[in-house]
Amino acid sequence: MSALSEILSYLIISFETSFTFHLEFKYKRTGIEKNESGVLVTVPRGKERQSSSEILDVFTQHIATLWPETQSSDQENEEEGEELEDAVAKEINSLQKKNKKELLTPIMLDMPCVYFVKTRPPIDPVRLVEFTCEVGKTKKMTRYTQRLIPIVRTTGVSLDDLEELAKSLIDPLFHEGQEGIKEFAVQANIRNHTVLKKDDIYRTVARIVGKQHMVDLKNFKLLILVQVIKNIIGISIVQNFEELRRFNLNEVYKQPENTKSIPNDSKLDNFDRDKNQIINDKAEHAE
């Protein structure tokens, strides 16, 4: 039995070493790819690794609450007479499942003050971020993490790619089975990219939303977030953006109980109001 126990320990350690190497390899990825979803995280300079460690813990707890079906239901009630061969197979199978179904993957971007946490289905990045910020109103959960920017899906950086992705996300909320006028705004952030301009983004998004809806920079119900990172575009459409202090965990926690919105003269993180004011004109002349 002792020999078999040693074999079991050796196999488990070997597999865990391989699994850890696989995680480290993914951790060293330095870019976001097409057709991914996740959360862009901003941090103080040099605190990317510390932030990723704490936010993964927070997200893991919230995923267990929001999507309990993702949690393992295996009961580790090994019977006393269980064969070691079966125990080896069970342990390796468990590690393989973790490997294949990892729900959160941190990705450093070779850019200061920002990194990406990739998510897998059924995780909804918008719901995860909004829930985390709601919890953050009354509970200090992180030290190094600042803004959480959900990205529902990514695509290439051409105008055609932007239009296709934007349409797929905008239509269900603005057109398909929807009635009435919706107040909206657009926030475009561009990092490490020089070809696509904010005007291009505003013009394209405004045309897809259509003239039947209204831009309202102060009291918008829906905010269309467009992130351009190197050669990738990511988009999400969110609510409660200002109520949740632009998804900034530090600001959410400091928020007074009765505060409902951000003062108009507050400095928005890359939220270029002057640029957004041209959206109405762009929409009228886009067609």
UniProtKB/Swiss-Prot annotation:
Pfam family of the protein (one): THUMP
SMART domains, A to Z: THUMP (SM00981)
Extent of Basic and acidic residues compositional bias: 266-287
InterPro entries per UniProt: THUMP_dom, THUMPD1-like
Any one of the GO CC terms: nucleus
Taxonomic superkingdom: Eukaryota
Molecular-function annotations in GO: protein-tRNA adaptor activity; RNA binding
Region (Disordered): 257-287
GO term, biological process aspect, one: tRNA acetylation
Protein name per UniProt: Uncharacterized protein C25H2.10c
